[in-house]
Amino acid sequence: LPILEMKRMVNVLFAGVLAMTVLSCGEEKKGYTLNGEISDVKDGMVYLKKYQDKSFIAVDSAVITDGTFKFEGVCTEPLAYGLTTFRDSKRPLVFFLDNEKMQLKMNESEKILTVTGSAINDLYAQNAPLTRQDGYSIDSLVAVHPASAVTPYFIVKDFAYKLNLEEMKALRAKLDASLDETMYVSQIDGFIKRMEDIQVGAVAPDFTLPDVDGNPVTLSGLRGKYVLIDFWASWC
């Protein structure tokens, strides 16, 4: 090939590689950065805990140096997390983790956590103290913020066991479709399914348990007979 033609081919190839590099960089997931200050602990450890299945589970930790700490990572969706200096603490200071650069100031002994740089945390901070008050209506939050991850979180955490089936379905129908695949909305769907399964007139959920002789007995195998089922809590 003539030298001029070869140069043209090299330039085209280089431009293609450069374009692919730019595109791949643009597709990189944006992560979160938490820059924290803690006023009641100078040095030690701080634990990041994820709210899951009605409890907080430690997923990361950072060293506290001269009252400051830092977390970095990527989250797949905005979810509730907690911060604590006690690894086994069941009541960390709660905030919403999103892929943003956030500034945190905390004092665990006084139960104070302020978060700046995240709009979702502004909404969480506004509503967290209200949802525990008598007379708070979750309907108003759903009506005003149907697309915020904060809304289904409060439904799951504070209202799932207070609402009947029709009330839960009504709230679910008002949530924005963009939340359909998120963790908290999936949990709401699970609550609705379980409530539907135990409505009067519905077929009872099947289960198998050993009888007094240790033989397995399945509820569906007793269909057509009079059956008395006695349930009690595991801690009784």
Where are these regions (language model features)?
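Alpha-helical repeat scaffolds
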Residues: 138, 167-175, 203-206
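A non-transmembrane, solvent-exposed segment enriched in polar/low-complexity residues
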Residues: 25-145
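Bacterial Sec-dependent N-terminal signal peptides
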Residues: 1-36
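Short solvent-exposed coil/turn linkers within tandem alpha-helical repeat scaffolds
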Residues: 145-148, 161, 178-185
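Short active-site neighborhood of thiol/selenol oxidoreductases, capturing the structured segment around
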Residues: 218-236
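Helix-turn-helix repeat elements of alpha-solenoid scaffolds
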Residues: 132-135, 162-169
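N-terminal "domain-start" segment that seeds a small globular fold
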Residues: 140, 186-220
